[in-house]
């Protein structure tokens, strides 16, 4: 086998396997990172596909079958990555339109694109660049129960009094910590926001509503200490991913929360419906996750299931809400985000729903990817419009 063909197969076969996951049911958890990488980094995979085709293009009468294998892999890579890439421009335009309409409906001027205005190919290649951000790690936020809660504080490089964003991590309420999304947090700080990312007690040792109480500990710390750190305690947003988004929404729904804006990425919506119909595929074993978090089954704890469901806290106005869901999310389907948006708006809450068609659950684990950059752009724009003065 000649060297060119060998390299083409070494590149083409595993890349084809990775990208094939993007169009398959996610039966096992290991498939999710592959699906995220395959879509978020699609332009890089497209280049790989073109290289594979270029290497295998030269005719080789001795290795004809292997040559066709390599060309087939290259074609699959180009097609599978291209299906994501072609949807980027209309998705970006639709997201901008949804943001502008949502902000205007809320009575806020649509802020101009800020630090992250467009999709940046260099960022896609080398990652987010935030060299001048100072992070205070392991700050004591307070005690909840018998557990000392800690947080990381990301300081903007600019002088002045900055809006504050409380970041709540995901992880199915049983894993994860405040370091989640640290590159995204640094990017928000670089855009002029003081970011506080806090821990909370985890299931199954601690059941709901312990986690909600822990978020309140972080909120009290922010109100007490933000001014001394260059933050404005009168301009607080709360943001979470997945499990953290559920906690963010419930925190904002509390009476006199003092929160000015809330952002949820792929938030759980209705634990009752999720228990009754976990859906398929179910790589997380949703009922086991709910049992671990809530402390029992729906039959045993029906009121707790309802109380933990954001859908049941939509009947009165909340602060302006930004929801971001992936159209390819097989853990928390887009239809739940659409239902939550409808109910929030019906209850008088100004709500912006951004849909990213190719995005999987936790797509922003690659914050410099296609969906990650789009989400960062929209989050910055939303926070700027709501919080900046």
Regions picked out by a protein language model, each given a short descriptive name:
Residues 223-238:
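Gly/Ser-rich "nucleophile elbow"/oxyanion-hole loop immediately N-terminal to the catalytic nucleophile
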């Amino acid at each position: 086998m000649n060297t060119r063909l060998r390299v083409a197969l070494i590149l083409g076969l595993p890349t084809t396997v990775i990208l094939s996951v993007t169009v398959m049911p996610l039966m096992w958890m290991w498939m999710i990172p592959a699906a995220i990488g395959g879509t978020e980094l699609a332009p890089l995979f497209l280049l790989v596909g073109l290289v594979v085709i270029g290497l295998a293009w030269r005719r080789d009468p001795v290795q004809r079958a292997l040559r066709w294998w390599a060309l087939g892999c290259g074609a699959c890579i180009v097609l599978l990555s291209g299906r994501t890439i072609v949807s980027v421009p209309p998705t970006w335009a639709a997201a901008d339109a949804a943001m502008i309409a949502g902000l205007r409906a809320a009575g806020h001027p649509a802020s101009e694109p800020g630090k992250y205005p467009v999709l940046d190919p260099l960022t896609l290649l080398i990652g987010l660049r935030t060299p001048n951000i100072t992070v205070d790690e392991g700050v004591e936020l307070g005690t909840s129960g018998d557990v000392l809660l800690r947080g990381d504080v990301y300081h903007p490089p600019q002088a002045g009094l900055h809006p504050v964003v409380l970041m709540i991590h995901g992880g199915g309420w049983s894993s994860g910590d405040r370091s989640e999304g640290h590159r995204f947090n640094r990017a928000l700080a670089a855009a002029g926001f003081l970011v506080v990312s806090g821990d909370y007690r985890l299931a199954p040792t601690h059941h709901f509503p312990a986690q909600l109480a822990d978020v309140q500990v972080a909120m009290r710390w922010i109100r007490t200490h933000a001014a001394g750190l260059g933050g404005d305690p009168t301009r607080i947003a709360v943001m979470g991913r997945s499990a953290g988004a559920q906690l963010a929404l419930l925190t904002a729904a509390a009476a006199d929360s003092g929160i000015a804006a809330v952002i949820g990425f792929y938030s759980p919506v209705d634990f009752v419906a999720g228990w009754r119909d976990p859906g398929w595929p179910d790589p997380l074993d949703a009922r086991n996750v709910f049992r671990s978090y809530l402390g029992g089954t729906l039959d045993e704890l029906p009121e707790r299931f309802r109380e933990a469901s954001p859908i049941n806290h939509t009947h009165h106005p909340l602060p302006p809400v930004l929801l971001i869901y992936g159209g390819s999310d097989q853990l928390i389907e887009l239809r739940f985000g659409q239902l939550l948006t409808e109910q929030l708006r019906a209850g008088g809450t100004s709500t912006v729903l951004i849909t990213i068609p190719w995005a999987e659950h936790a797509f922003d684990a690659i914050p410099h990817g296609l969906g990650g950059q789009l989400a960062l752009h929209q989050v910055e724009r939303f926070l700027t419009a709501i919080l900046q003065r």
